[in-house]
Amino acid sequence: MRLRPLLGAAAGAALLLLTGATAAPATADPATAVPAPYEAVTVDRVGRIATDGTVTLSGTYRCQSSSGPVFVSSSVSQGVSTIRYGTGGTRAVCDGAEHRWVNKGRPVPGSLVPGAAHVEATLMELGAFSGLLPRFHAVQGQTVTLTRG
């Protein structure tokens, strides 16, 4: 085994650690800081499972402005499963006012049952500024109760 590459790697790692340790964190001056626009998405505490298996999730959202189309997307999972089921998307209006969203989707039959579930809602923009990459305005994860009906 050659010692020179190992010494070079160790010296480089030490240099990075020492440089990072002396860097001061950036802080904003409260007098000149511009507040971020108020953007949020919420999830209602109850979701519905229809007799045909369609899941309906809902909540509210608020966003200030956008340069491209904005959507509220949602997904649901249940139990210890790592599988998340998408429940569609709603086109959002970014005018600073609070709006309702309702998404419906039909996951694999029998995959969701009445009871506790975890829902994640995302307020996401698709714009020319990012190519194909989305810009996330807000994300909310919440435990909900799925009911029949």
Regions found by a protein language model. Give the residues of each.
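Short beta-strand elements
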Residues: F129-G149
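Enriched for extracellular/lumenal, surface-exposed ectodomains of secreted and cell-surface proteins
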Residues: A121-G131
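Short aromatic-acidic-glycine turn motif
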Residues: S77-T87
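Short proline/glycine- and polar residue-rich coil/turn motifs
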Residues: T51, T90-R100
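Short, surface-exposed binding/anchoring microloops in extracellular/periplasmic proteins
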Residues: A36-G79
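Secretory targeting and sorting signals
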Residues: M1-D29
